[in-house]
Each structure stands twice: as structure tokens, then as C-alpha cells.
């Protein structure tokens, strides 16, 4: 029964998170606070994806080169605190830069300082969720005593590992946008 429950939980985890994350692509255009933030599906997806890629790449390469302190050795023995910090910093810098380059944020808005703080905070939060998603996928793999979810990308955790970070960060982004929109509509 434990195996059946674990299998069902994994399917629900992957299915729900994938559904929410892909819902980002179909977000209708949102103009929060009239001039500060303008979101749509494509811009939102690119914003989240840029954070995922930057976080994953910097965490991996800085962790390999400079990582001395293990982050969660029982779940993922190769991940380091140094890599995690570097990944988070890169995620914030790349995410914030992407938001401005794609004109998600209007740099000429009167309340630009507040907007920058919000984008920095959101980028930091999403970068952390990227790493949490990766750890959750690693925990699931450890629970089933498998190294890779598939052999499509040998040595790289398999097909789900290419998407776990994006899916986990995506669900949080989607929920934050939806809650923010509801709060602003009620204000």
C-alpha cells in the first residue's frame, strides 16, 4: 500500500503542478496598478523561466567549483550552500533584469522604487522555490531508490528533473498573480 500511495502521490504532484505551471502561458493580460506592472502569458513564462535557468545554472556551476558546505546531504548530496546562494543571487539579478527588458515593469512609473522592491522580492522568492522544487524531486527519487526519472538525459536526473524547478516555481508564480489580481480587484 505504501508503494501505491507513493505512486499516486507522485502522479498528483506532477499533474497538478504541471497544470498550474502551464497555466502561466495562458494568463490573460493583467495591468496591475495601471502603470507599474503589465503581465501576459508569454512575458510571465519567460520571466519565470529566466529565473529557473539562472538559478539552476549558477547553483550547479558555483556549487561544483566552490561548494564546501552541503545543503541537504540526505536528499541531494551534491548540492551546496554556496551553490544555493549563488543560484539565488543569479535568479534575482536575471529575473529583475528580464522584468525590465521585457517591459513587464514600467521604469518611468512614479512608484518605481516600490515596484523594484516587489520585483526583487518576487524574483528571490521564485529562485528559492526553484531550489525547493529540485529538492522535492530528489526526495521523490530517493524514496523510490532511483537515480533518474528516465534515461532520456542520463546523469541529469531524467526528464522530470529538466522541468521540476520550472513546474514548482510556476505554480507559485501563478498563485501569486491570481491572488494579487483578486486583492486589487477588491481594493
Where are these regions (language model features)?
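Hydrophobic transmembrane alpha-helices of multi-pass small-molecule transporters
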Residues: 91-92, 162, 169, 178
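Juxtamembrane helix-loop transition sites at the ends of transmembrane segments
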Residues: 31, 77, 104, 155, ...
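Hydrophobic alpha-helical transmembrane segments that constitute the membrane-spanning cores
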Residues: 94-98, 172-177
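Acidic (Asp/Glu-rich) catalytic motifs at the cytosolic membrane interface
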Residues: 52-68, 72-73, 81, 128-170
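Membrane-embedded alpha-helical bundles of polytopic integral membrane proteins
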Residues: 1-124
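Juxtamembrane boundary at the C-terminal end of a transmembrane helix
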Residues: 175-187
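Short, highly charged low-complexity linear segments
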Residues: 23-24, 121, 128, 155-163, ...
Amino acid at each position: 500500500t505504501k508503494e501505491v500511495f507513493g505512486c499516486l502521490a507522485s502522479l498528483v504532484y506532477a499533474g497538478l503542478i504541471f497544470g498550474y505551471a502551464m497555466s502561466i502561458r495562458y494568463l490573460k493580460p493583467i495591468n496591475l496598478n495601471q502603470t507599474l506592472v503589465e503581465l501576459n502569458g508569454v512575458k510571465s513564462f519567460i520571466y519565470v523561466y529566466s529565473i529557473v535557468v539562472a538559478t539552476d545554472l549558477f547553483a550547479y556551476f558555483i556549487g561544483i567549483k566552490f561548494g564546501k558546505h552541503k545543503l541537504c546531504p540526505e536528499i541531494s548530496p551534491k548540492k551546496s550552500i554556496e551553490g544555493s546562494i549563488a543560484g539565488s543571487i543569479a535568479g534575482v539579478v536575471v529575473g529583475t533584469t528580464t522584468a525590465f527588458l521585457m517591459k513587464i515593469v514600467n521604469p518611468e512609473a512614479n512608484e518605481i522604487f516600490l515596484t523594484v522592491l516587489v520585483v526583487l522580492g518576487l524574483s528571490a522568492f521564485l529562485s528559492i522555490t526553484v531550489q525547493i522544487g529540485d529538492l522535492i524531486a530528489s526526495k521523490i527519487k530517493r524514496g523510490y531508490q532511483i537515480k533518474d526519472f528516465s534515461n532520456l538525459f542520463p546523469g541529469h536526473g531524467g526528464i522530470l528533473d529538466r522541468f521540476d524547478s520550472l513546474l514548482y516555481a510556476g505554480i507559485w508564480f501563478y498563485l501569486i498573480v491570481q491572488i494579487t489580481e483578486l486583492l486589487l480587484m477588491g481594493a
